[in-house]
Design a protein with these regions (language model features):
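Conserved AMP-binding/adenylate-forming core of the ANL superfamily
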Residues: 16, 34-77, 81-85, 102-107, ...
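A short helix-loop-beta submotif of the ANL/AMP-binding
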Residues: 69, 75-95, 99-103, 112-117, ...
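Conserved AMP-binding/adenylation subdomain of ANL enzymes
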Residues: 218-235, 242-284, 298
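Conserved pre-ATP/AMP-binding loop-to-beta segment of ANL
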Residues: 151-152, 160, 170, 174-199, ...
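AMP-dependent adenylate-forming
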Residues: 22-44, 162, 166
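Structural core segment of the AMP-binding/adenylate-forming
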Residues: 61-62, 92-172, 297-300, 307
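Gly/Ser/Thr-rich phosphate-binding loop
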Residues: 279-287, 291-358, 363-370, 378-379
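Conserved structural elements of the adenylate-forming
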Residues: 49-54, 178-179, 191, 210-231, ...
């Protein structure tokens, strides 16, 4: 595993937030702002802060601490955010797990990332995640206080929200009658501490895992948000799952950095997504080309009022002055899991390119990375 932008003595310039505890402290200035809106949930920043603090206390009481590897397996929902924040704010190394992964692949991820504790939901869009864990770990035995799984030898507890009748599932952690130590633990979390293991999609090879520190990923998301002009008045829709770097950096952490709201669903469906965008007055749409095209081709597209949209990747929803005359004049970017998301971006995002910059991927994102072009054989700079 490779750290993307970590350094032994990480420092954060210009007063930028340097860790998840610092981001949460920033959001307390506007506690009532909406953090997440789904088809059936609303979660404010204050609610996420309170709920994750309680879960953090419970995790500490169970033995989770700095460096403990905590897997997160939920759809894009409030409990994903609460669980991830709870583990991250006390210094645990979070391991977001793919809800796309079938049993065999999920088992490999659990073993490869040395997960010790899993926080998970029962299902996603009607598909049973509990059965998938059982498929992933056929040798899973035991129950409280610990479990044993030969396929994932470090795994000791699996917590299923809100409950589960499997013998190996532990009751969801409760903060009742435990010491309140999370705030003290937060004081021990710094920018150089590991925050998250992000696993690649595995499109061209076996999925690989990348470790990012608090300082590297929080700073990256903060700079991205400022460069794109995201603010607390924005409402960002994206079907990108929170467990991949796009959803984590471009959606979850940008919302925490700015106070913007996240609009999300269990699964993408063009008609219901268009209804969500109109109802919740989305301002940014960040999605893959296939999802954009599916919405543009849907019969409801012409009926929906998307006049609130001011930026993003769905050309058909952009205001006329931000819509390029030709598709290849739409600005693009380059990104990698290893760089925590985009590492290039045009100087004025979400606006058409001039013809002389057709197909440009922009410039190295200021304050994030430096680029060099080298001969791959000799290593000599071009």
């Amino acid at each position: 595993m490779a750290g993307a932008l970590a350094a032994a003595n990480d420092s954060t310039p210009n007063g930028m937030p340097a860790s998840i505890p610092e981001l949460l402290a920033m959001r307390r200035a506007e506690p009532d702002g909406e953090f997440l809106v789904t088809d059936n949930e609303r979660l404010t920043f204050a609610e996420a802060d309170t709920a994750s603090l309680e879960l953090a206390d419970a995790l500490l009481a169970s033995g989770v601490g700095k460096g403990s590897r905590v897997g997160i397996l939920f759809p894009n929902c409030a409990q994903w955010l609460i669980s991830w924040l709870a583990a991250a704010r006390i210094g645990a190394l979070t391991v977001p797990l793919s809800t796309f992964a079938p049993g065999g692949e999920l088992g490999r991820l659990l073993r490869h990332t040395d997960v010790q504790v899993v926080l998970m939901g029962q299902s996603i869009a009607g598909r049973d995640l509990v059965d998938r864990i059982q498929d992933a770990l056929p040798g899973l035995t035991g129950g409280e206080p610990v479990i044993a799984a030969p396929e994932a030898p470090y795994l000791r507890r699996i917590y299923v929200w809100p409950d589960c009748d499997r013998s190996w599932a532990a009751p969801w952690p409760s903060a009742e009658s435990v010491a309140s130590l999370a705030c003290s633990a937060e004081n021990e979390v710094g920018p150089a501490d590991d925050l998250v293991v992000v696993t690649t999609s595995g499109t061209t090879a076996q999925p690989k895992s990348v470790v990012h520190t608090h300082g590297s990923l929080v700073r990256h998301a903060y700079i991205l948000a400022r460069h794109r002009g995201v603010s607390s008045t924005d409402r960002i829709y994206s079907p990108m799952p929170f467990f991949w770097v796009g959803g984590l950096t471009m959606v979850v952490l940008q919302a925490l950095s700015t106070g913007a709201a996240v609009l999300a669903q269990d699964v993408f469906e063009a008609g219901s997504t268009l209804a969500l965008l109109e109802r919740e007055r989305a301002t940014f749409i960040s999605c893959w080309a296939q999802a954009s095209q599916a919405m543009a081709d849907h019969p409801d597209f012409a009926k929906r009022d998307l006049s609130s949209v001011r930026g993003g990747t769905m050309l058909e929803a952009l205001p006329p002055d931000r819509r390029p005359r030709e598709p290849d004049l739409m600005p693009n970017l380059l990104g990698m899991t290893e760089t925590g998301g985009p590492h290039t971006m045009v100087e004025v995002p979400d606006t058409p390119l001039p013809p002389e910059l057709r197909d440009s991927f922009g410039i190295p994102l200021p304050g994030v990375v430096q680029h060099r072009i080298v001969d791959p054989a000799s290593g000599v700079e071009a």
